C-alpha cells in the first residue's frame, strides 16, 4: 500500500481493470491474473473489476463472479479488489453484492441505476438496500450520468454517506463543483474519487482521496508519484506529472472507453484480445494517434 494517507480503505490509485478475452471471445482468466499482478506491482493500490472499463454490460454474472475470485486470489493482501456488482435492478444488485462479499473482495462498486432513471428517493432506497444486505462490505457509489441518464444529486450523497458501509463515491460527472459540495457536507472519512484521469489532481486539491483510473494501466507508477507528491506538499512536481500525462488522458477517450486503453495494451504486447459487440475496434486514424502518444511517453516496447 502506498505512503499516501487516504481517507479510503481502498487506497488512492485504483485501476478500472479491462477484461481480457481470448480468440474465441471468452474471458481469458489467465491473462486477467497476469494483468492484475502487473497493475498491483506498478503503482495501483487496488483494482476495480467488472466496471465500465471491464465491459460489464456484456459479461455474464458467472463470468463476473469468476473474475472476482481469480483477481482477488492473485492480488491477495497486496491491494484492494472492488467488485462491480451494480445493476438497475435492486434485487440483482443485492444478490451480486452478497456473492462478491462471500468471494472475499474488499469492496463493491455500485453504479447509479441506468435506463430506468429512478428519482432521488428511489436512488436513496436502492443504495440503502444494497448496503444493508452486505453490511460488512464497504461500498463505493458510482455517479456517471453520461452513461446512466441519471445523476446522483449531492443532497442524496450526503444522506447515503451516513450509512456506515457506504464509504466512497466515484464522481464521474466532471464537475468539481459537485465534488466540492460533497466534500463540504460529508464526513472526513467519506472518500471522493475522480472518475476521470484528467481531474485527479484538481480533485485532490478540493479534498478528493484519489482516482479510479484508466490511464493507470499504462502509467500507474507515474500516477502514484503524482498523488504522493501532492500529499507531501510538492505541488509543483505533482503538476509537472499531470501536465506531462494530459495527452495520454485525452487520447484514451478519443473513442468509447475501454476501446482506446485496450488497444494501447495490445500495442504494448498484452494479449487482452478485442471487444464484445457492440463495442468495436479503434479506427486506424485514432490507433496511429494513440501510438504516437505512447511513443512520446516511452510506453512502447
Curated annotation (Swiss-Prot):
Catalytic residues in the record: 142, 170
Subcellular location: Cytoplasm
Family matches, as InterPro entries: Aldolase_TIM (IPR013785), DapA (IPR005263), DapA-like (IPR002220), Schiff_base-form_aldolases_AS (IPR020625), Schiff_base-form_aldolases_CS (IPR020624)
GO-annotated molecular function: 4-hydroxy-tetrahydrodipicolinate synthase activity
CDD domains registered for this protein in UniProt: DHDPS (cd00950)
SMART domains for the chain: DHDPS (SM01130)
Pathway in which this enzyme or protein is active: Amino-acid biosynthesis; L-lysine biosynthesis via DAP pathway; (S)-tetrahydrodipicolinate from L-aspartate: step 3/4
Principal EC category: lyase
Annotated SUPFAM superfamilies: Aldolase
Residues marked Part of a proton relay during catalysis (site): 52, 115
Binding site for pyruvate: 53, 212
Subunit structure and binding partners: Homotetramer; dimer of dimers.
Family: Belongs to the DapA family.
Full protein name: 4-hydroxy-tetrahydrodipicolinate synthase
Lineage of the organism: Bacteria, Bacillati, Cyanobacteriota, Cyanophyceae, Synechococcales
Recorded name of the encoding gene: dapA
Amino acid at each position: 500500500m502506498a505512503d499516501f494517507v487516504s481517507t479510503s480503505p481502498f487506497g488512492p490509485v485504483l485501476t478500472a481493470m479491462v477484461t481480457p478475452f481470448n480468440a474465441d471471445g471468452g474471458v481469458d482468466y489467465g491473462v486477467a491474473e497476469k494483468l492484475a499482478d502487473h497493475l498491483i506491482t506498478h503503482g495501483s493500490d487496488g483494482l476495480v473489476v467488472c466496471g465500465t472499463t471491464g465491459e460489464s454490460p456484456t459479461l455474464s454474472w458467472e463470468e463476473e463472479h469468476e473474475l472476482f475470485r481469480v483477481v482477488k486470489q492473485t492480488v491477495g493482501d497486496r491491494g484492494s479488489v472492488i467488485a462491480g456488482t451494480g445493476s438497475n435492478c435492486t434485487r440483482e444488485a443485492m444478490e451480486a453484492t452478497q456473492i462478491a462479499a462471500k468471494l472475499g473482495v474488499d469492496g463493491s462498486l455500485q453504479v447509479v441505476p441506468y435506463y430506468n432513471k429512478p428519482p432521488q428517493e428511489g436512488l436513496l432506497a436502492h443504495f440503502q438496500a444494497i448496503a444493508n444486505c452486505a453490511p460488512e462490505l464497504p461500498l463505493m457509489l458510482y455517479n456517471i450520468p453520461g452513461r446512466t441518464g441519471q445523476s446522483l444529486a449531492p443532497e442524496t450523497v450526503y444522506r447515503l454517506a451516513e450509512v456506515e458501509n457506504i464509504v466512497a463515491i466515484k464522481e464521474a460527472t466532471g464537475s468539481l463543483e459537485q465534488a466540492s459540495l460533497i466534500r463540504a457536507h460529508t464526513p472526513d472519512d467519506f472518500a471522493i474519487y475522480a472518475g476521470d484521469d484528467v481531474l485527479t489532481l484538481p480533485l485532490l486539491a478540493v479534498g478528493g482521496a484519489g482516482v479510479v483510473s484508466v490511464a493507470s494501466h499504462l502509467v500507474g507508477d507515474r500516477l502514484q508519484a503524482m498523488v504522493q507528491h501532492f500529499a507531501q506538499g510538492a505541488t509543483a512536481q505533482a503538476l509537472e506529472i499531470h501536465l506531462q500525462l494530459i495527452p495520454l488522458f485525452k487520447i484514451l477517450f478519443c473513442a468509447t472507453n475501454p476501446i482506446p486503453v485496450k488497444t494501447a495494451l495490445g500495442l504494448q504486447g498484452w494479449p487482452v484480445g478485442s471487444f464484445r459487440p457492440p463495442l468495436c475496434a479503434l479506427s486506424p486514424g485514432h490507433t496511429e494517434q494513440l501510438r504516437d502518444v505512447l511513443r512520446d511517453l516511452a510506453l512502447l516496447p
